[in-house]
Amino acid sequence: QQHYGFSPFAFSICFAVNAVAIGVAATISVKFRQLETGTLTGCIGMLCLSVCVMIALYNGCGFWTYELLMFALLFTMGLTFTSSTTLAMDSERRYAGAASALLGALCFASGGIVSPLVGLGNILVSTGVTFVVCAICSLLCALWAMRKVPMKVAMCRIFR
């Protein structure tokens, strides 16, 4: 908001537009024949677009470039919301309530961890790097959950 010189009201309009991207993608994600495909597509899209956002922010992109990339990034993120939650709840139906609580707590904990990280150093660069790291973690977790990559391999890739 401050970097691009927008008022709080103008920037809240941008948030609303981005929220539409998430909502539309969440609606579309149920159209995939397999829920895993929606999650994997979203995670791969998040990684690709996070790298684009990081490069754009590093190069001091204009607002419209930033907004278009964020809209696309949040769209791909929205693809993962419905399918990943459904897959998590379906994996252990007996413990769906506990799984839901853990997912909610994980989201809040992740937000608490990430929030101070984006303020380190140059806020544009740290934000871009944080997006990429979170996208990598999301993709590795999705691959591990789908059993396409053993947990040991996924963890090694995260901490490499």
How does the language model describe each region?
Residues 11-32:
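Transmembrane alpha-helices of Major Facilitator/SLC transporters
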Residues 75, 87-123, 130-131:
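A late C-terminal transmembrane helix in Major Facilitator Superfamily
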Residues 39-83:
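C-terminal transmembrane helical hairpin of 12-TM major facilitator-type secondary transporters
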